[in-house]
Structure formats: C-alpha cells, structure tokens
From Swiss-Prot:
Protein name (database record): 5'-nucleotidase SurE
Organism the protein comes from: Shewanella sp. (strain MR-4)
Subcellular location, principal: cytoplasm
Catalytic activity: a ribonucleoside 5'-phosphate + H2O = a ribonucleoside + phosphate
Pfam family, one: SurE
One GO cellular component term: cytoplasm
A GO molecular function held by the record: 5'-nucleotidase activity
E.C. number: 3.1.3.5
Compartmental location: Cytoplasm
Keyword entries, A-Z: Cytoplasm, Hydrolase, Metal-binding, Nucleotide-binding
Similarity section: Belongs to the SurE nucleotidase family.
Cofactor note: Binds 1 divalent metal cation per subunit.
Record-listed a divalent metal cation binding positions: D9, D10, S40, N92
C-alpha cells in the first residue's frame, strides 16, 4: 500500500488538511503531522532552540509545536512507521503563487520532503471566503496518482494552485511558471490596549506579472496551475556575468 505523509502550515485543525487527508486516504495509507497552530508565512524555518512537543489526536493526526518544516522532518526521521512514498502539503487556505512561494510554509513543508529524498507536492486553494476544498482535494488526489505512476525529476516539487470553484467549473490543468507581485502594501502601525506601539505587516502586493503562462493567469482563467519548483536557488545564467564582474574588481 502506498504511504503518504500529509502536512500543512495552517495547522492541524484546518479544513484543508482534513479534506486532503480524506481524499488521499482513498488511494493510500496517510499519516498526518501538522503544526498545532497556524504557521502561515513560516517558510523553511526550523525550531532549533526549543524541544518539539507532539500531541497524538483522537482522529489519528499528530500535532507538533513547531513549524511546517519541523513537522515533515520529525515525521520522516522519527514518527513515520516506515518511509513515506510521497509528501503532500496543504490544502492551504489561500494561493501560493509567484513570490508567495518564498514565504510559504505550505511550499516549505513540501521542500523539506524533497530535501529528505521523497517526491513532494504543495497544494493551495485560491481565494478568501473559501468554499471548495473538495475541488482542490480531488485534483490533489488525481495529481498524486499521476506522480506516483510517472515520477518527475528528483530535484523538483510540484506547486499546485486551485481556483475556488465547483469541480465541474474548473477548466483543466495548466503547467505554469511563477508570476510576480508588486512589493507588499504598507505596515499598519497602532497600539495595544496597554498603549504600547505595535505593528502589523500589510497584505501582499497585487500582481505585477500575471501574463499568459504564469500561475496567476491560469488561476484567473479558471484553471488549476502546476509549477515545478527546484530547491537549488543558484542563478545559473548569471554565473559567467558575475565571473566577469569579479575579474574586474
């Protein structure tokens, strides 16, 4: 039987991870290990200065007082009964497109799975007042089945974004590149009840590159977006340019 490790960054009680676990349980043995709270924006952070405490829940899930990356690392290295065949992260409440991927704990959980040597997928549902986790779960299951049957290169994860639409209104799947956003909106400056100064980070910037071929464009036109991501951040096309620059200094 196929074994799949499921995690997320919205927390172990989020509706997305429940929908994902139930959908994947139809094709695999699923182990669900996720943060005990919302860790959105945690990126690839690890907890190195405190112990990781876990709680085994009545529904079989395991919550971890740690980040999404902690969850996947701990699950694979210690908690899983045998290695998983795949790591699937999500379903995130909100898209992870363009620059979002740099900050996303959802994407980071998948990246950690790939870093440890396993095929990995991150899946997110675009929108705010989300209604259609079932649509995202169905596409997640379909894509996971395809990935198991036809593996991709070992240095990649698949970043999937699904429009918040009924299943029969989604037009299909498009392979995309990452788009881009304008810089984030301003900081909100205010005071807490005790009169102390506090700050809230503003919402993400609007789309800057949402042209055809991007994840933003696919979602806006009712398609599921799949973008292959690599862990290697090296800007290979700039190596020779940088070498020329170094030779001049």
């Amino acid at each position: 039987m196929i074994r799949i490790l499921v995690s997320n960054d919205d927390g172990v009680n989020a509706p997305g991870i429940k929908a994902l676990t139930e959908a994947l349980a139809e094709i695999a043995t699923v182990m669900t290990v996720a943060p005990d709270r919302n860790c959105s924006g945690a990126s690839n952070s690890l907890t190195l200065t405190n112990p990781l405490r876990i709680n085994r829940l009545d529904n079989g899930y395991i919550s971890v007082h740690g980040t999404p990356t902690d969850c996947v690392h701990l699950a694979i290295r210690e908690l899983c009964d045998g290695e998983p065949d795949m790591v699937v992260s999500g379903i995130n409440a909100g898209a992870n497109m363009g620059d979002d991927t740099l900050y996303s704990g959802t994407v980071a959980a998948a990246m950690e799975g790939r870093f440890l040597g396993f095929p990995a997928v991150a899946i997110s549902l675009n929108g705010k007042a989300l209604k259609h986790y079932h649509s995202a779960a169905v596409y997640a299951r379909r894509i996971v089945q395809g990935l198991l049957a036809h593996p991709i290169a070992s240095d990649q994860i698949l970043n999937i974004n699904v429009p918040d639409l009924p299943l029969d209104e989604i037009k299909g799947i498009r392979v995309t590149r990452l788009g881009a956003r304008h810089k984030a909106e301003g900081i909100v400056r205010t005071q807490d009840p005790a009169g102390r100064e506090i700050f809230w980070l503003g919402p993400p910037g609007v789309e800057q590159d949402a042209s055809e071929g991007t994840d933003f464009h696919a979602i806006a036109h009712g398609y599921v977006s799949i973008t292959p991501l690599t862990v290697d951040l090296t800007a290979y096309r700039q190596l020779s340019v940088l070498q020329d620059w170094v030779d001049k200094i």
